[in-house]
């Protein structure tokens, strides 16, 4: 049996750090961002739909101009919804195929690293969900420092995602990432013990 652990959080909460720690332990990661990049780079049907919807200039020599596309959809809910309608079904199909392969190979634990896990309803295909949490003021401070953003711009980015507190309340496992790296590692160890207990893995 394969246990699928969904991993999500908010921007600048430390989800990527947790994902890297899991990968270092040899746990396979299905990375939603990587899958999305592969779909944009390699799927000609998706590229054609992006050109038809947003303009021919967004695909040059078989490559999507991701920076231009990002600028176009950021802060524009209608454009973002159009892009998601084009890409989300293909991304989901790719992720589901990877999950089927993991099951076929009897991989005991696979992590689905998905920034929009709840927004796109992947919790329905996960056996458990881990949320990396920060109170919004700490999240804001980290994002402003990391990306050199104004408070207003950082808040816009945070508010473009679903409420982190809501995600935390829905999760099976929560890491509160306000402390040190060692504290983060200790919490992750506890989560993995909980996953082993729930899944029957030793």
Swiss-Prot record:
A Pfam family annotated for this UniProt entry: CoaE
Binding site for ATP: 12-17
Principal place of residence: cytoplasm
Molecular function terms from GO: ATP binding; dephospho-CoA kinase activity
Organism superkingdom: Bacteria
Reaction catalyzed: 3'-dephospho-CoA + ATP = ADP + CoA + H(+)
NCBIfam families found in the cross-reference section: dephospho-CoA kinase
Known function: Catalyzes the phosphorylation of the 3'-hydroxyl group of dephosphocoenzyme A to form coenzyme A.
Protein name (record): Dephospho-CoA kinase
Originating species: Latilactobacillus sakei subsp. sakei (strain 23K)
Gene behind this protein: coaE
């Amino acid at each position: 049996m394969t246990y699928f652990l969904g991993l999500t959080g908010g921007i600048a909460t430390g989800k990527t750090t947790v994902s890297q720690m899991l990968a270092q332990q040899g746990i396979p990661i299905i990375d939603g961002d990587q899958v999305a990049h592969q779909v944009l780079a390699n799927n000609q049907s998706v590229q054609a739909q992006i050109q038809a919807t947003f303009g021919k200039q967004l695909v040059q020599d078989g490559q999507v101009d991701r920076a231009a596309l990002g600028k176009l959809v950021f802060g524009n809910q209608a454009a973002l919804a159009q892009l998601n309608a084009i890409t989300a079904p293909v991304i989901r199909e790719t992720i589901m195929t990877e999950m089927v392969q993991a099951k076929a190979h009897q991989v005991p634990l696979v992590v689905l690293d998905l920034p929009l896990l709840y927004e796109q309803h992947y919790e329905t295909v996960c056996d458990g969900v881990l949320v990396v949490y920060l109170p919004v003021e700490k999240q804001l401070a980290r994002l402003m420092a990391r990306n050199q953003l104004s408070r207003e711009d950082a808040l816009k980015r945070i508010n473009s995602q679903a409420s982190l507190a809501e995600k935390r309340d829905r999760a099976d496992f929560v890491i509160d990432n306000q402390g040190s790296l060692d504290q983060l590692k200790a919490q992750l160890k506890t989560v993995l013990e909980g996953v082993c207990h729930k899944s029957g893995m030793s």
